[in-house]
Amino acid sequence: MPTAARKEKLTRVLSRRQPDLQVVLEGVTIAHNASAVARTCEAVGALNLHIISPHPEKVIFNEAITTRAEKWLLIHFHQTTTEALSILKGQGLKIAVTTLSPQALPYTALNYCQPLALVFGNEAEGISTEALSLSDYKIHIPMVGLVQSLNLSVSAAIILYEAFRQRQAHGWYEKRRLPDSEFE
């Protein structure tokens, strides 16, 4: 039986969850990355983590990295990118994909105070052409060094904390965002 203090903490945390800020990992193959992204999702209050993989049984979270954060997330598995992004669009979310395309917006130029799914591609190939074609926004993290990109989990953390910063500045963490049916 949870203590009163534990119940209060859980209520406080749940009241800050952001049901309309969702994260999608497309074809991620390195368990460390999926684990680190799950931990970052939980830290910023993103409740839903979607994983696109034809082999969901191979997606294993490393508890040493997640610190059991996945326990507090709703994790959804999808066989295909079209399936996942169609479901999210059907829920009224806009799709923002990370890409190295020169036409992409800097990640700080995106308005994160809207229903949004952030899609991160796999470590080797990045985002698929399918995800690009289904996206509403294309974003990138500007760089001035010689490397083209950052590690997947680092990119996700940078972008999720920009979403957190914008939503916090607009008071989105000060009022409960989960509907009663999910909050209870």
Residue spans for each PLM region:
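Post-transcriptional modification and biogenesis factors for structured RNAs
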Residues: 1-184
